[in-house]
Amino acid sequence: MTDHRPSPEEEQTTANEERTVSNGRYLYCVVDTTSSESATLSTTGVDDNPVYVVEADGVGAVVHDCETVYETEDLEQVKRWLVTHQQVVDAASDAFGTPLPMRFDTVLEGGDASIERWLEDHYEGFRDELASFAGVWEYRINLLWDSAPFEETIADRDDRLRELRQRQQQSGAGKKFLLEKQSDQRLQELKRERRTELADQLKEAITPVVNDLTEQDTNTPLQDEHSSIEKEQIVRFAVLADEDDETALGDRLDTIVEHEGVEIRFTGPWPPYTFAPDIGK
């Protein structure tokens, strides 16, 4: 008996069949439709699908019709979908004010009627959350540090490190190795202290002008797009702030940038992705 293995085309067809949904609606966000004269949105979404609003008593879901969920191993395709998803949420923000953003690839079956029931089932929660986020936005703050200037001058300010380096220069090979190790340990200790100090200073500076703040994970060192200097991510914050406080927030970040070797990357305003509750699943 011949073992029939599916061709790539057959495998793709099978995968698509497994991901088919019945009268699906892809959700981008939930909005307060009372904040706009018209509960409509003129834009296209993922895969150029027309986007529209399904409304239930002043609360609307921004959706498009879909027949499959959006899953692929093609990372570039996923990135394109994510960018489009964000663009639709941005358009909804412009039209209706701060939305409650949904996760990428959130799909409900059952057509517009199921969306209306979903909105009605979670109506009180949606109304409360939309009211609480009205006029506030999420901002992302990333503190980067080039430690080279610090390493070049810290011995002038730290007696212990200066002593170790002086003894190292005056010692023989065996002793010199141990002193070099101690010197490096002291330098690393001082750098850890400086990282903590910078993060604390940033948090202290921005806290008075934000409504909420959460620390996010940092990755390994970033390469600056305009420089060969490798900068370390010290801390990343997501903050929730009133739109009127954006300038004040930026001014406070400027005081942190004055420190040598420090760079702040400040982005926003974003919908409250980090702070919006996972309601209405």
Curated annotation (Swiss-Prot):
Effect of a null allele: A single deletion produces no gas vesicles.
Q: Name one GO cellular component term.
A: cytoplasm
**Pfam families per the record?**
GvpL_GvpF
Coarsely, its chief localization is: other
Please name the GO terms of the biological process aspect recorded for this protein, alphabetically. gas vesicle organization
Q: Where in the cell is it found?
A: Gas vesicle; Cytoplasm
Induction of this protein: by what?
Answer: Probably part of a gvpF1-gvpG1-gvpH1-gvpI1-gvpJ1-gvpK1-gvpL1-gvpM1 operon, maximally expressed in early to mid log phase. Gas vesicles appear earlier when grown in static culture, possibly due to O(2)-limitation.
The reply on keyword Membrane is: no
Q: Does the keyword Kinase apply?
A: no
UniProt keywords (A-Z) are:
Cytoplasm, Gas vesicle, Plasmid
What NCBIfam families does the entry give? gas_vesic_GvpL
Family membership noted in the UniProt record:
Belongs to the gas vesicle GvpF/GvpL family.
Any further remarks? Encoded in a 14-gene plasmid locus called p-vac which produces predominantly short, spindle-shaped gas vesicles during all stages of growth.
Q: What does this protein do?
A: Proteins GvpF to GvpM might be involved in nucleating gas vesicle formation. A minor component of the gas vesicle. This the only minor gas vesicle protein that binds all the others (including GvpC1, GvpN1 and GvpO1, but not GvpA1), suggesting it might be able to assemble them. Gas vesicles are hollow, gas filled proteinaceous nanostructures found in several microbial planktonic microorganisms. They allow positioning of halobacteria at the optimal depth for growth in the poorly aerated, shallow brine pools of their habitat.
What is the annotated quaternary arrangement, including any partners? May form oligomers. GvpF to GvpM interact with each other in vitro, and may form multi-subunit complex(es). Interacts with GvpC1, GvpN1 and GvpO1.
- Designated name of the protein: Gas vesicle protein L1
| Originating organism | Halobacterium salinarum (strain ATCC 700922 / JCM 11081 / NRC-1)
